[in-house]
Regions:
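Rossmann-like NAD(P)(H) cofactor-binding subdomain of soluble oxidoreductases
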Residues: 1-10
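Alpha-helix N-cap/loop-to-helix initiation residues
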Residues: 2, 30-31, 122
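Internal alpha-helical scaffold of NAD(P)-dependent oxidoreductase catalytic cores
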Residues: 16-103
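Charged/polar positions within long, soluble alpha-helices
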Residues: 72, 76, 138-141, 160-167
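Interdomain hinge/lid region at the active-site interface
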Residues: 86-154
Length: 177
């Protein structure tokens, strides 16, 4: 899993695959020898090969890649729609907004195609996210301090369990420099 919100050759990086997970989804006809050879090739590029079924890949990426892009894009569009003529929201948007919406600058064509290809999994994850948002809204409306605290504490704890000492969320296993 590698990339950025920018596309095209001018935005390429020779370290793009360094310590990135490279998901392999071999079909039933792929021999163990071919899978091993390809895994070794991926490893030689500095990436971390991970073998998943196509179904696992599609569900996992719906949650950790596709939904975040949908959230970022919809948040940008929400703020754009709610902002006034003086564009105060746009003007004061700072680190938090910029961090969560950076990926909204990605290629609309690419993300349109991803959403059209992984519809079932995206819809499943999106339904669960909407369910969680409804619960959060109830907690806010009811001024449920305990539920709100649990929301932020649980998300902080899970997020803090992700190794972010290297670029991206992947742990730095080696240096290719």
């Amino acid at each position: 899993m590698a990339g950025s919100e920018r596309s095209g050759f001018s935005n390429s990086s020779d370290h793009l695959l360094e310590n990135a997970y490279y998901i392999l989804t071999p079909g039933g006809q792929v021999s163990l020898n071919k899978l091993t050879a390809f895994s070794e090739l991926v490893d030689s590029l500095g990436a971390i090969p991970m073998v998943l079924t196509a179904e696992e890949h599609d569900f996992i990426t719906a949650g950790v890649s596709h939904l975040p892009h949908i959230i970022a894009s919809s948040l940008v569009n929400l703020v754009s729609a709610l902002d006034n003529d003086a564009e105060y929201m746009k003007t004061i948007a700072a680190g938090g907004f910029r961090d969560i919406t950076r990926i909204a600058s990605s290629s609309p064509v690419m993300w349109q195609q991803i959403c059209l290809e992984n519809t079932k999994n995206i819809s499943t994850v999106l339904d669960e996210y909407i369910r969680m948002l409804i619960q959060i809204r109830c907690s806010v409306d009811n001024k449920d301090a305990d539920q709100l605290y649990q929301l932020f504490a649980a998300s902080r704890d899970y997020r803090d369990s992700i190794d972010v000492t290297s670029s991206g969320l992947s742990p730095k296993l080696c240096s290719l420099s």
